[in-house]
């Protein structure tokens, strides 16, 4: 069951994270099996399906670091994942709990890549004319959506708290 009382089931939230990580790995496997490194397939006038590797962080930050970044980002991902699992188990607010679940799923998907491949496989390339957004993957999408959900639920939660009338209890 997804909802227990007013809380979301931590097992459902962790299952969502696992499903996201597994889906991310399935897409990456498909890309690696069907395309050579550096290959791209034009899908629309603004989107390519690509096979690229990223040894760095978002936007290839630290990609030319010489190898240390693999272990650094593995360590960061493990610490963040443990923290997110703790937050999911506490499950204070539904929107935030779902956000943590999305971020955890994305972090796990990219962590698996870093541990077993030494790099993250990217497959989505959006562009306009000659300008390309940095390539990304399903895990990155989950992380960004989770971050946006966290910010919006936090802001909406604060707005709801400021609009609530005092109940007279001190």
Swiss-Prot record:
It catalyses: Release of signal peptides from bacterial membrane prolipoproteins. Hydrolyzes -Xaa-Yaa-Zaa-|-(S,diacylglyceryl)Cys-, in which Xaa is hydrophobic (preferably Leu), and Yaa (Ala or Ser) and Zaa (Gly or Ala) have small, neutral side chains. The active site is at residues 122, 140. GO terms for molecular function: aspartic-type endopeptidase activity. Its EC number is 3.4.23.36. InterPro entries: Peptidase_A8. Keywords: Aspartyl protease, Cell inner membrane, Cell membrane, Hydrolase, Membrane, Plasmid, Protease, Transmembrane, Transmembrane helix. It comes from the Bacteria. One of its GO terms (biological process) is proteolysis. One of its GO terms (cellular component) is plasma membrane. It is found in: Cell inner membrane. Its main location: membrane. The keyword Zinc-finger does not apply. Pathway: Protein modification; lipoprotein biosynthesis (signal peptide cleavage). The chain crosses the membrane at residues 71-91, 97-116, 131-151. It is a multi-pass membrane protein. This protein specifically catalyzes the removal of signal peptides from prolipoproteins. Belongs to the peptidase A8 family. NCBIfam families: lspA, PRK14776.1. This is Lipoprotein signal peptidase. It comes from Serratia marcescens. The gene is lspA.
